[in-house]
């Protein structure tokens, strides 16, 4: 049991980051990678799990699960489940050159990746209960609440929404060739110089929704609000 009779319960995250740098961004050949992620709180038990706060309960990218018991969250001033984020920022460029006796060629490529992904919270148990006080709201975003036998959410207002992930990707490829040329036409030989360039570019901007999932595998799913229930891009099942 985790009880804060007059205060709040905040299950936050710890941010981690990883960097990889080769060359300068202005160099024809370079690789820069920055990755970030969050590590949330994990609570697991075979029996009952209870979190009770006289204030609010906030859980970000948290996993709370009872394998055979009841998981209950009581927040007098409200309960909020939300997603954490993991990101990727990559810039990479390569260039290859080759030279022969009368010709030369070069191939270059540039890659860019900017990813911002949602990683939701999850709550599970044989039975799951989320209960807010008369003046408290329940907000669930990009997260899942799944029980084996019964799932119940009660509060003043209940809001269930999706979290967004965005992926920006671009690639650019270019091939250049140059060199001397020779031809024979009607017995006349001629020589010259030629230069060619071919380019290919691809860009993608993709937004994906991570739906919230509220349900029970074998029993009932109950949402009871004194005022309003608002669901957007959510899956409710029983």
Language-model segments: which ranges?
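Binding/recognition "hotspot" determinant
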Residues: 1-238
């Amino acid at each position: 049991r985790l009880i804060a009779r007059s205060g709040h319960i905040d299950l936050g995250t710890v941010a981690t980051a990883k960097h990889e740098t080769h060359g300068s961004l202005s160099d024809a050949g370079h690789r820069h990678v920055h990755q970030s992620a969050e590590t949330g709180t994990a609570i697991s038990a075979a029996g009952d799990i209870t979190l009770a706060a006289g204030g609010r309960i906030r859980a970000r990218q948290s996993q709370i699960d009872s394998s055979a018991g009841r998981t209950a969250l009581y927040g007098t001033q409200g309960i909020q489940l939300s997603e954490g984020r993991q990101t990727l920022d990559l810039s990479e460029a390569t260039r290859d050159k080759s030279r022969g006796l009368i010709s030369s060629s070069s191939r270059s490529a540039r890659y860019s990746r900017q990813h911002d992904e949602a990683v939701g919270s999850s709550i599970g148990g044989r039975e799951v209960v989320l209960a807010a006080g008369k003046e408290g709201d329940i907000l669930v975003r990009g997260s899942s609440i799944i029980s084996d036998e019964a799932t119940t959410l009660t509060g003043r207002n209940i809001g269930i929404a999706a979290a967004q992930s965005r992926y920006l990707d671009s690639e650019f490829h270019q091939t250049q060739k140059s060199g001397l040329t020779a031809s024979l036409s009607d017995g006349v030989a001629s020589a010259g110089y030629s230069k060619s360039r071919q380019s290919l570019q691809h860009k993608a901007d993709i937004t994906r929704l991570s739906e919230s999932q509220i349900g029970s595998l074998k029993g009932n799913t109950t949402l009871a609000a004194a005022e309003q229930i608002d669901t957007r891009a959510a899956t409710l099942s029983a």
